Amino acid sequence: MIMDYHSWVYPNIPEDANRQLLKLGDSLVVVGVLGRSRNRHANKMQAFDMKPNSSNYQPIEGQILCYFTPGTSTLFLHFETPWDEVILSKLLLEEKDPEKFDFDQFYETTRNRFIRHMTLALHVCHILVYVETAQIFDMKLVTIFQLLKQVREQQIMQFAPQLLAELPLVGRGVKCRLCTPRILFLFENYPHDEEKTKETISAYEFQTEDSIYQLLRHHNIVTNSSSSSLLALPNNKQFVFYNAYEDLHPDRLLQAIDSLNRAIQKTDLKEDEEDLEILELSPFEGFVKPFGEFPVSRAILLNPKDEEEQYKKDHTAWHFLQRHVQDALQNCFDEGSFKQGSPQGQQFQRLNINDWHKWMDNLYKILIANVANSNYETNNEDYRVYLRNFDQSLNYERKFWLHLCELGLKKGISCYKHSVPAFYGQETHDKLLAEAILAFEEEGRGPPSEATRAKLSAICLKYWQDGRQQCEQLSLRRHPCTQAKEAPHEKHASGIIHVSSCNCGRTQGRREDPFTLRQANYEFYEYMAQICNLCVKVKQYQFPIFEPSVSDYRAAAFEAAFPLLHGGKPNAEGGEQAAGACEEDEQLTNGCSQPLSATFGSDLNMSIGDFDSLLEGSQVEEPEISYGSADEDDEESLSNTNESLSENTENELVLQFKGPQKAANNDDELDETETIVQSSGGYSNSTTEYLPGLVHTFSNPSLLPMFPSWSLACVGPSSIYSHNTGLQEHFQSGFLSGANFLLPWDVHVRLVQAQKNQHHLQQMGKKHLQRYRKSHLSGGDRLTLKIFVGFEYECSRGHRFMMCSPERVLRGGADIERDTSHKVVHQNMPLYYPCPCRSQSNYLAQLMRIHVVTPKAPVNIILDPRVCVGQYTFTLGTVSPPRLSQSAYWMLRLPYVYQGDDNLLTPPQKLEADDILSGGYLLAGMFGVAETEANATSAPTLDTPATANFMRI
């Protein structure tokens, strides 16, 4: 295809084009074409029917393509900018790290590059044509024009007059440009829903012109003075053009199909002689004629008669532009554009091609080329600032966002420091920081907000760590220490105060939040014992503790303290056995009123050791317990018993004692039994290493704790408790109303001796045996034990209450029934329970004391509590469970804090009603009964352990 115009890349002008341009002299009008494009050549000249010479043309950012049609006075400068889609796509592909792509920065960079190219066009062109692919005006252009005006007035006009002083044209004016360029807008696409008539198209163009004019006037882009106006708009001339008829970017395939269709649809007027010969062969007239409408005849197209056809013919971009070119050639370019005109000769400058090239070369070098040259040096300070800070000066959005973020940063810091305490921990710091960030977000916006938010966090963190950081050592109740981290302090303190009772329960005191196990389970109660009038008088059970033999004693290593948790297969089996201990105990005891454990060693071998190993091969036999009717027991054990059974023997506990196989005399036998128990009273305890935590079923039996975490005390005789009044305030303080009663528990016991041992009993003396039966046995060898028990819970506010079942708080005498005690004795009792003093379910009370009032009977009550918390089963740590004396009020105080091998077992935050045992529980079956030793004195013996001659009730 032969083109009737010249096309070249600046500054490589062809000789033919240069020669023809020289003929024009100073009648040369330079038109700059900028804007958007969507084709692969970045061609915005399609409306003027121009395109690059080569079909393989590759557009480059910053490249200027020149077009000139001989016979005209118009030189087109086609600027290729980042706003062309093909160039924009290349810039996106050049991004090195797509994952860290910053859209705001990329947009600012492309916009600044477009402004740089448009700045050059403002100074070297008479007319600017902005090409828009959309159907409406782009509002971002207003911002572009504002930035252009800022760059020209605040930067270019500071250095350009001095740098261009050597050019002769500069002496004609001080504006450093040929004129105030006239801006025209070319829209390549017309709205599809609008009619394509002269009236509709003109109305749409006029409406767009009014909107653009108001915007440019409102933002001072166009003013009354040419010296202060960035652009010019024509007066009473159209400056908006919509391409309504021509398809500037057609689909080539559709064009080929349409051409083929038109070639087939020929009229009779256009038929050639060859076509007539073919028509003669047709069987009838119109055989090969197409159906449908015929195209409009060429005569009609060549000779339009109506106004619409003429408007369609004249409504082209070329005609639209030439009207403004003629204004430039007639020296009336600024006539009517500005109310305040400039002096004659300074309004408009037309140059010949050589002078214009010199002008273009200098401005291109100043505005474009030197910017890309990083080694360029200049003595002009203003120009140096332009080269270095051009992008920064245009990024007004970033400055705006930074300003907002600075305001938000100050507000956030002020909010953080406003209510900060003297010392505070991580939780308080996080809370204050969250409030500071919320205060920052009220002002801070935009892309820099994330970095400023991180800066705010760093400033607040530094402020916190600058002498205000809290110790934050957690207490055993998970409360942080409030002391300063850097300041020396001998003792941690969380500032939390609890109210707890002493060992005997008579006196309540304020206790600080404990940080060590010794403070929690021992030191507080030792302190309370000094100020309590009852604690100093009561008789305490002495639990075994570590007694060092050297001065450099130490805590046992973890593997040594808990051997069952490490090692090979035997230890693994032991772990499996221990893991199922709690579950087996629960299955054996839960919900039963009958005694569930036959022997001492059968279900306590994981808590206090196996009696077979303790006795080291001794032949002391364990008691046998049988259940059922009294008749069956008599037939098996005492065939010579002639007494009749009472009607309440169904729930009797039958304890059968088997005497030793050989005995010289009664006294020697008793002495031998007592000696065996004492000799089996413990393992070879370590005197150099102690147990660091609480004793549990996995603990090494040879290791003892440094201090007792349990307390067992006889607070007085059984007469101090009255079931009519309950526990009085002067005796047990802090109980809630109605929850201060113990539960009566009747236990029926029948003692049975083997036949082979009857002769042995007769030798003990008839007088002693008769006193035993008369004073203590009713109905022969049957006796009823009247026991009072109470499971006391205590919250951190000092409120105490008893439970009548695992799910119910005792509410007074009405809740006490005949079988109420069985609900607490034969069922697992929760370690934690919601305190009724508050409505919040997460305010928990803890099982702290077991009250036992022993009966006046020739038996001793045995205590063997086992507390299951998590995977641990905690015990008293004694070789044999303690024996309680008769007719006395005993109180067992449980540990305040439970600690496992390597972790703290804290109370749960909240208990669910359907899983009240999730926080831990006291295993059922903690009570046992044993016959009083024959040589026991009337005074209670606290250090006498229970032998194998007892049964669990």
UniProtKB/Swiss-Prot annotation:
Keyword NAD: no
Record flagged with keyword Transcription: no
Record key words, sorted: Nonsense-mediated mRNA decay
Amino acid composition bias (Acidic residues), ranges on this chain: 621-637
InterPro entries: SMG8-like
Biased composition (Low complexity): 638-649
Highest taxon, organism lineage: Eukaryota
Gene Ontology process terms (BP): nuclear-transcribed mRNA catabolic process, nonsense-mediated decay
Region Disordered: start-end pairs: 621-649
Transmembrane segments: none
Family under the similarity heading: Belongs to the SMG8 family.
Function: Involved in nonsense-mediated decay (NMD) of mRNAs containing premature stop codons. Probable component of kinase complex containing nonC and recruited to stalled ribosomes.
Name of the protein: Nonsense-mediated mRNA decay factor SMG8
Organism the protein comes from: Drosophila willistoni (Fruit fly)
